Amino acid sequence: MHGPVSRSSSSSNMTDVSSPAGGAASPVEMTTSSSSAATTSASSSKPLTNGANKTTISTVAGGVAPGAVPGPGSGAIPASSSSGNQVKLEHHHRQSNNNRPAATNRSSETKLRSPAGESDGASRLMTPAGSSSSPSQSPSQTQASIQTQTSQQDRLAKASTTASQQDVDEVARLFEEKPEAFEKWLTERAPPEALSRLQEFIENRKPHKRPSVTSDLFQQWMAASPTVQQKSPRSLSNSSASSLPECRRHLMDLDEGELFMELIRDVANELDIDVLCHKILVNVGLLTHADRGSLFLAKGTPTNKYLVAKLFDVTQKTALKDAVTRASAEEIIIPFGIGIAGMVAQTKQMINIKEAYKDARFNCEIDLKTGYKTNAILCMPICNYEGDIIGVAQIINKTNGCMEFDEHDVEIFRRYLTFCGIGIQNAQLFEMSVQEYRRNQILLNLARSIFEEQNNLECLVTKIMTEARELLKCERCSVFLVDLDCCEASHLEKIIEKPNQQATRAIKSADSFEEKKMRNRFTVLFELGGEYQAANVSRPSVSELSSSTLAQIAQFVATTGQTVNICDVIEWVRDHNQIRAEDEIDSTQAILCMPIMNAQKKVIGVAQLINKANGVPFTDSDASIFEAFAIFCGLGIHNTQMYENACKLMAKQKVALECLSYHATASQDQTEKLTQDVIAEAESYNLYSFTFTDFELVDDDTCRAVLRMFMQCNLVSQFQIPYDVLCRWVLSVRKNYRPVKYHNWRHALNVAQTMFAMLKTGKMERFMTDLEILGLLVACLCHDLDHRGTNNAFQTKTESPLAILYTTSTMEHHHFDQCVMILNSEGNNIFQALSPEDYRSVMKTVESAILSTDLAMYFKKRNAFLELVENGEFDWQGEEKKDLLCGMMMTACDVSAIAKPWEVQHKVAKLVADEFFDQGDLEKLQLNTQPVAMMDRERKDELPKMQVGFIDVICLPLYRVLCDTFPWITPLYEGTLENRRNWQDLAEKVEMGLTWIDHDTIDKPVEEFAACADEEIKDIEFTVTTLNCNQQSQHGSEDSHTPEHQRSGSRLSMKKTGALGKAVRSKLSKTLYNSMDGSKPKTSLKLLESHVSEDMDDKSPTSPSQPQASGSMGRMSASSSTSSTGGQMVDKSKKRSKLCALL
């Protein structure tokens, strides 16, 4: 009797061992293994006990036992294979025999050949077996196999005991010292057995994969196409009709318990839902002797559930492929509560009908079509672990002579479906993961397509529609694009304009539905029909859109921003008062329509799917997938529109640059005039001096001075700069400076002259190449091009276009870009004669030098420069060191106004302060914020103090280290020290109430005294007896407890709000200056003691000595000393002494 053939989840891991077709079955001995392990692992063998003979039928994946003779076509390894393979098999036996009884370890396993004509991929059913040996294996062969295994184990044990630790260390030392020799021995002389054992050791040390369904089966399933999956051994249940009776007769020899367990194992690990359902119906037929069966799966939403026939009328002879094809061709949908299966699904109760035609719920239409008569029906629900209905199984007519299903059949059916419910839910989850994986792959491909098709909107939308149609299996797909006024010039800026968060959140309640419809007017329509139809792109008119029902539905979605899933189009049109177009509605069954939005959540289009291929409505799952498509579609369309508009903006920018270049370039008349001018010598402009000033130079002289610097550095002839090009470039640079108060062309000239003086007078040209000198002079002249009078912080706060364009060193990057723009303008390229390598080098120098004028860059580089100087660095020719040196020189030149003579420095400081105050006013006006002290006009009196801080933090440390390293630039350091003393003096005077900033010069710092100069002050006597009198001598009743605001004194009177008043101080100022000039005062002044008696520093120590004054003021103090009351005098403070010296 031949062994039966059935389906098994592990059949794909089995190897057929068969004799020629038509021959008798000859069992062949296979590799021994544990039967318990075979029943628990999908990759292990599954033995079957065949009736009373108890013959063990099993397989082991990968081969046969040593000495076994494989049949023709076998995939097993013959006994005459290499010794390496033999060692692998023996090692496998040793692993399987560990910690197990000898009788169990030597239970033989065999596999019978399938009957003639049976498919090689057919699955086999296996049940637990005894431990009897196969009759085809002789006792001598079995004994030889056991002896071979024993000898292998003894040899390994002996090797482990004889090898000492010293031997192991010696071998390890040889391997470490001569790895090449060991590798050569392995490749040339190592025996195969040693190589095989080495491979085993390596494999055993590898980490094992986690035993998971997704680790093997899922990846296998993903790699296979649907065709391959249907033809794979584990998925095929469509064996020939002639084999099924054989299988049935064999299983009938099993007792009920063994058969039940075997059929449970048959479906336990099956993940293909089609194969699983086919196995369930076939196995249920075996258990209950039913003629045929059907299986329905629950679908739909919680409020609208229905059953779908997965497989219908499956008999023992129905092949899987035929069953699946028939179910797909004639999809049967049964709502819950309708018919026998629907009633079972709704009530979760079993129905056992003995006579079907007498039951009102029975539908005889199928019998009429097929000619088959249904007598008995047993229908039972399939539930998951939570008790929810996931399907219904139905069997029809018994075949063993009984006319109805008894209680025993019901119990067997119920018990078996309990296990089947677990398998079905697992298979459904696996199918969902497979679908999700495929969807993700499609979405990834879609994302890839989006990035590939950035420059063509039509190709992009066509790709998106094709992917959506293939994934969701719909008949047609359409995309409507909303009119974005792309032709308007203002829209080009709107596309890239940073969105206003408040504006995007604001909702205008006054907008009506019709107004929104007008804004969301469609201009482009993309349509994609069947599989072999090309996409159609059109621009429908308003009348065409208003007469199309599909367009009206899309218009509704675009206006409301809602997703609509329409099952009945006619009813939806009637409910929403839309115009019905008969030509479209008649062929439309279901519509899924969704808005397409951009990054600002603005509707830019509508995607529409029409009619699913199987005629059913679109599900929530379809809507979720389509939502992902809509998101990708929105990103793709938005990006493509951005790209198209960016191209337009680039074209627009080129036009603007052409216009800017024309207007930024100096005129031909100016160029010719400067070319013909005579350039004076450098000494006449005082170019070699660090005390250079441009105050006496007219604008044309400034350009001539720049030309002289280029000539003196021999740059014109060295780099073959055409003279007219150089003149035009200088004039163009001057033209591109804005007329701000400080950062203008004059400032650029002073910075360039300081660099020239450092190179020539300071002898820094010794450390520079001619190309670097050219780059530094160009950088100095261009380092503040197009300066707007505001700093980088202001650009960032106001979120100006420059701050968006450049995130760091905003203005410096803009200055460099303007420099490049001028050089690229026609007739302005002074680098035109340079080689490409020299051009790159000089442009790199210019860029680095201009960016170094940002004080933030200075602070980053200063520590590295100080470290080099402190280490005694004298070689500055390295690239990094040269870059640091040039950066420090640029900063030194940029702030060099602080080292100019005092009569120049205080005027420049006034210009800087005015520009800063203008920025502070803008911050108050535009940002509604309080500016910092240096930019706050209301704190202008603090400027001297801030100047001292600026010198101490930035200027003096820089000039000191440069002076220590390069002593020829000492004048910069000395001039800075001198100006610091002047600013410190002014700061102390401001603390005493003197201000200066409202004057163009600082010649008359006591400016408040001139406020009421026009008023005639009469009869005011002012006699200066002393500037420091004892408080108690004048006011004996006042002591230290007297409130300060009640005390009178000269300090209060000297302040702007003092008791003396502006008129008195104006007269005082005139008198003091007239006295200094030697002229006689017009009015005899006497300073009342009540206004000047208070000491300016209450904590000053007393002294019996009286201070002396010089000049006429000293004489005034001496002559008036007799009018004092003789009170005790105190010493003057330091500040009082300075005030006396001023007076």
Swiss-Prot record:
A divalent metal cation 2 binds at residue 784. GO terms for molecular function: 3',5'-cyclic-GMP phosphodiesterase activity; metal ion binding. Belongs to the cyclic nucleotide phosphodiesterase family. Residues 1036-1047, 1090-1100 have a biased composition (Basic and acidic residues). This is cGMP-specific 3',5'-cyclic phosphodiesterase. A lipid is attached at residue 1140 (S-farnesyl cysteine). It comes from Drosophila simulans. The gene is Pde6. Residues 1-167, 1031-1060, 1090-1143 are annotated as: Disordered. Residues 1141-1143 form a propeptide. Its EC number is 3.1.4.35. A divalent metal cation 1 binds at residues 747, 783-784, 894. It is found in: Cell membrane.
